Amino acid sequence: MKVVRTLVMTVMVGWPGIAGAQSLLVPMDRTQHNHLKAYGLTYWTLEQYSGAEWLLNYRGGSFLLPDMEGVRRQAALRGITIEPVSAADLAQIRAVIADANMETVVLEKAPNVAIYTPPNSTPWDDAVTMALEYAEIPYETIWDDAVLDGKLE
């Protein structure tokens, strides 16, 4: 019985994902299959769960999201590469960031996004709206009247 218990513990510690990740790393380096959608996943996570981290200069500016079933589901649906991160992995990531030209930015809530564009434009008329549409990041459009009338907040 003691041998079985030791074997189970060894497998759980040695196999990432079984012991349970605390966070999900969304890499933004060449391992990421869908960079724009990854930004959208981070935005969605901030809307749903409020809280994420942007790891500046770490693997292309990766994101650290909470390991929630909804986040995993959205990543799978959107074709986004994610990596489970254990507490030990997270400590190692933080050590790498502390020792290099890197920084962690805490993201607390999803921002309001507005695009300055003519009212009759379509999303494919410019790169910004097309990128936001593809990433599934909600935005409002504003044009001259809103600016001149002082309707911006």
Give the role of each language-model region.
Residues 1-5:
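Positively charged n-region of N-terminal signal peptides that target proteins for export
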Residues 23-24, 29, 33, 64-73, ...:
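Helical hinge/lid and interdomain linker segments adjacent to catalytic or ligand-binding clefts
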Residues 37-74:
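N-terminal, post-signal-peptide region of Sec/Tat-exported proteins
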Residues 71-83:
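Short amphipathic alpha-helices in soluble, non-transmembrane regions
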Residues 81-110:
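Non-catalytic propeptide/linker segments at domain boundaries
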